[in-house]
From Swiss-Prot:
It is found in: Cytoplasm. The gene is infA. This is Translation initiation factor IF-1. PANTHER family: TRANSLATION INITIATION FACTOR IF-1, CHLOROPLASTIC (PTHR33370:SF1). SUPFAM superfamilies: Nucleic acid-binding proteins (SSF50249). It comes from the Bacteria. It comes from Hahella chejuensis (strain KCTC 2396). GO terms for molecular function: ribosome binding; rRNA binding; translation initiation factor activity. Keywords: Cytoplasm, Initiation factor, Protein biosynthesis, RNA-binding, rRNA-binding. Residues 1-72 form the S1-like domain. Component of the 30S ribosomal translation pre-initiation complex which assembles on the 30S ribosome in the order IF-2 and IF-3, IF-1 and N-formylmethionyl-tRNA(fMet); mRNA recruitment can occur at any time during PIC assembly. InterPro entries: NA-bd_OB-fold, RNA-binding_domain_S1_IF1, S1_domain, TIF_IF1.
Amino acid sequence: MAKEGNIEMEGTIIDTLPNTMFRVQLENGHVVTAHISGKMRKNYIRILTGDKVKVEMTPYDLSKGRIVYRAR
């Protein structure tokens, strides 16, 4: 269901920020700021520090992203 041109990467939550924003360290070492996608917010999926997540980013701004999946 991903749109054309979006980049999906795996990462780990390293910090929790206000307004459901998170700091995520990607597998390649980069750190991005990410928010929760609407479906995860609607289904009350909780994300804690240390969780493995899948982050979707646009090629236009690689410093921000959207968390689309939390691994168990």
